[in-house]
Amino acid sequence: MMGSPVSHLLAGFCVWVVLGWVGGSVPNLGPAEQEQNHYLAQLFGLYGENGTLTAGGLARLLHSLGLGRVQGLRLGQHGPLTGRAASPAADNSTHRPQNPELSVDVWAGMPLGPSGWGDLEESKAPHLPRGPAPSGLDLLHRLLLLDHSLADHLNEDCLNGSQLLVNFGLSPAAPLTPRQFALLCPALLYQIDSRVCIGAPAPAPPGDLLSALLQSALAVLLLSLPSPLSLLLLRLLGPRLLRPLLGFLGALAVGTLCGDALLHLLPHAQEGRHAGPGGLPEKDLGPGLSVLGGLFLLFVLENMLGLLRHRGLRPRCCRRKRRNLETRNLDPENGSGMALQPLQAAPEPGAQGQREKNSQHPPALAPPGHQGHSHGHQGGTDITWMVLLGDGLHNLTDGLAIGAAFSDGFSSGLSTTLAVFCHELPHELGDFAMLLQSGLSFRRLLLLSLVSGALGLGGAVLGVGLSLGPVPLTPWVFGVTAGVFLYVALVDMLPALLRPPEPLPTPHVLLQGLGLLLGGGLMLAITLLEERLLPVTTEG
């Protein structure tokens, strides 16, 4: 679609010519008249009725051209025009700013004839359409152009100025008179409407199989770092420092998972672009950013309400009602306080010692969201197999997403890898804390992490194969991965952050909010820098 104001004026002039407002009789130019009649027949066949162009047909034609209404385009937004021959530096007249009055001055300096478009008869002496005496080859070429049929225009291309002039039997070296330019207007108008000069965006070339496999393998190796890192943190940090760290990591995982799903995976699954031609994010990133903003806003509001509730900042009527209910339930004459006490069986031998042992060693800390990956309280062997199965399937799906992402590009793989990494660290912390509590050794835990990493590597190879195979399935893999990420973040991890087992102090809540904001901002930065990351990776 031609977007400059000069193009709109040219299209409007073409419509003016087609409607017959130029007036006067057209000189017999041979193939030019025949070419003009062809394009007029095409336009009137599409938008006319019974050989005439009605108001409705004209409205549809203007709508198809992108005319008839203000497009909200400013002159200052136009970049350098492409496809136009470079003018000499000495010719300063071509570098003047586009002024609508310039064309008026040019046409005002021309001698006007009876039709108002200049005297078309004064050019009989120079014979500009014919030029000098045609050679034998030029004459043969013009004779061949006399026979035009509809079949000659079925496979039309985007014609440049020279091709248009040759098709009309005019000399490319001779200047055009206003009448000759009017003859070209139906062809220009038809080409604008048929959009033969608007090329569809070329499909992205398929990624390199070897580089995608190598990058996916390196990413899977990077994702194996949370396992030894979690073991190190469990040994070095105590519960007092581990709890706020787990809250921050859980919020960071929620931000990265939601950010990667909304700002990257879903736009690529819909085969869209992240930003417009000017690199502005409001076109494609607006919905994703609004969802992230709403997520962060509700997170802050719920935590603020929780802090106010636990500090006792409630209306007096509610506190008085609660005090009355508590005194009524604790009344010794009222049996309601005793009715809710559960029955206790007789203590078994050794049960008292077990309770003392449990009171001395509190259960390991579960990270936010780990209840979605809970493995129950079975024996050590059952817990080991549950962890192996759950983590293996989890790493398999993560590897599948990473392989598909690196097949699409380096920035895609980078954002997905960071999202998975931020999620894996608190997940591995919870798993290893539970397994250590069940009595497993560090050596067996490392072996278990190696097995899970091998399954992740297999998933990465499968993701690359599905994306770069004969039938690319990258949009489907991205869509499924986005759904998985949103489910894990919003159903598995976020509820644990909002409903902790005990009230959190204000610094812990602020730390979680910082983690959520940092995760979403990290995904936004990678998305905005995607176009800059692509040339670096291709050159490397």
Curated annotation (Swiss-Prot):
Pros-methylhistidine, modified sites:
H375
Keyword match Repeat: no
Q: Which residues lie on this side of the membrane: Extracellular?
A: 21-212, 266-287, 466-470, 530-540
Residue span of region Disordered: 78-101, 324-377
Localization, UniProt: Basolateral cell membrane
Q: Where are the transmembrane segments?
A: 213-233, 245-265, 288-308, 445-465, 471-491, 509-529
- Positions of glycan attachment: N50, N160
- Keyword Lipid biosynthesis assigned: no
Q: Which is a Gene Ontology cellular component entry for this protein? A: basolateral plasma membrane
Q: How does it sit in the membrane?
A: Multi-pass membrane protein
**Modification note:** Methylated at His-375 by METTL9. N-Glycosylated.
Q: Which GO terms describe its molecular function?
A: monoatomic cation:bicarbonate symporter activity; zinc ion transmembrane transporter activity
Keywords in alphabetical order: Cell membrane, Disease variant, Glycoprotein, Ion transport, Membrane, Methylation, Phosphoprotein, Signal, Transmembrane, Transmembrane helix, Transport, Zinc, Zinc transport
Query: Mind listing the GO biological process terms from this record?
Result: BMP signaling pathway; cellular response to zinc ion starvation; eye development; G1 to G0 transition involved in cell differentiation; intracellular monoatomic cation homeostasis; neural precursor cell proliferation; positive regulation of mRNA splicing, via spliceosome; zinc ion import across plasma membrane
**What does the tissue specificity note say?**
Expressed in liver, kidney, pancreas, small intestine, colon, spleen, fetal liver and fetal kidney.
Q: Pfam families this protein is in?
A: Zip
Q: Where is the composition biased (Polar residues)?
A: 90-101
Oligomeric state and partners? Answer: Homodimer.
The family annotation for this protein states: Belongs to the ZIP transporter (TC 2.A.5) family.
Q: Which disease is it linked to?
A: Myopia 24, autosomal dominant: A refractive error of the eye, in which parallel rays from a distant object come to focus in front of the retina, vision being better for near objects than for far.
Function of the protein:
Uniporter that transports zinc(2+) into polarized cells of enterocytes, pancreatic acinar and endoderm cells across the basolateral membrane and participates, notably, in zinc excretion from the intestine by the uptake of zinc from the blood into the intestine. The transport mechanism is temperature- and concentration-dependent and saturable. In addition, is also a high affinity copper transporter in vitro. Also may regulate glucose-stimulated insulin secretion (GSIS) in islets primarily through the zinc-activated SIRT1-PPARGC1A axis.
Its recorded name reads: Zinc transporter ZIP5
Per the UniProt record, the source organism is Homo sapiens
Whichever gene encodes this chain, its name is SLC39A5
